[in-house]
Amino acid sequence: DDDLADPPQTMAQCLQQAQDATVAAIEDGQILMDVEFPPLAADLMDDPNTSAGDMAGANTRLAIKYAQGIVARTGKKVAILYPDVPELERAVEQSGSNTPQPGVSLHSLRASIAEAETPQQAFFALFGKGKEMVREVPEADVYVGLTFSAQELPDVEELDTRESSKKPIILFNLKLDTQRGDLGLPAFPPKDLQWRFLSRAKAVYFLRTRQYTLSLPEPPFVVNYQGAIFRQYPGPFQCLLDTGKAFRPVSTSARRPALGCLLY
């Protein structure tokens, strides 16, 4: 289909497509959005030596470039949000500034203990709890949420609830598929966070690759192959098969298919 977007061949293409999809979604009035793609090359993603810090650092670099494109295309100011002050400080140290690009600024969604106005707020802040400690960024037009865990997602919901002007909120590489599976477990938010909040997040850009194995009754007995699920708003989700030279669309869907869509 000539109307189907081609999956990216490089990280630069991936970022460009994510920016295109986000700008189109914002222009269509979308408020809560999900952008998901591998922040590192496949071999690094699978490497056990790749730490959470490596992933967070890669996502910070990508989010700044992504936000830079949103600013250039829309003129809107973008606030990149981290769950807490320590995460913010690491990002500022890495990027060299809390305003790494014109129109792009880095912030903690949750205020520090020093900013607590009551002993109760200080107590809750110590354990990363209490909606009163969630801080908006008045000068921002768009929010990009980075490195939030499942336990920290209620803070993003609180931000979304407060924003009377309904500024766009983009959940950036948060692996929401995995996080949804943790809801309802001990020490995690209840499952209704999915229905109240996460279910409203529109996947405006989505790229997930997966390895598959096909068993045969005759030689070579086992065939390994790779596929991907890809979506660039406003187009449909595509199930793609890696032919070795390029990805070939196998099926399309208005709703996100399961990761097993390419199992034979």
Question: Which sequence ranges carry the predicted segments?
Answer:
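Positively charged, amphipathic N-terminal segments that serve as targeting/anchoring signals
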Residues: D1-D155, T161-S165
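Ser/Thr/Gly-rich flexible loops in soluble cytosolic domains mediating phosphotransfer, phosphorylation
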Residues: T147-L153, D160-V204
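A conserved mid-domain beta-alpha-beta active-site/ligand-binding segment of alpha/beta enzyme cores
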Residues: G181-L259
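Conserved small/polar residues in nucleotide/adenosyl-binding loops
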Residues: Y264
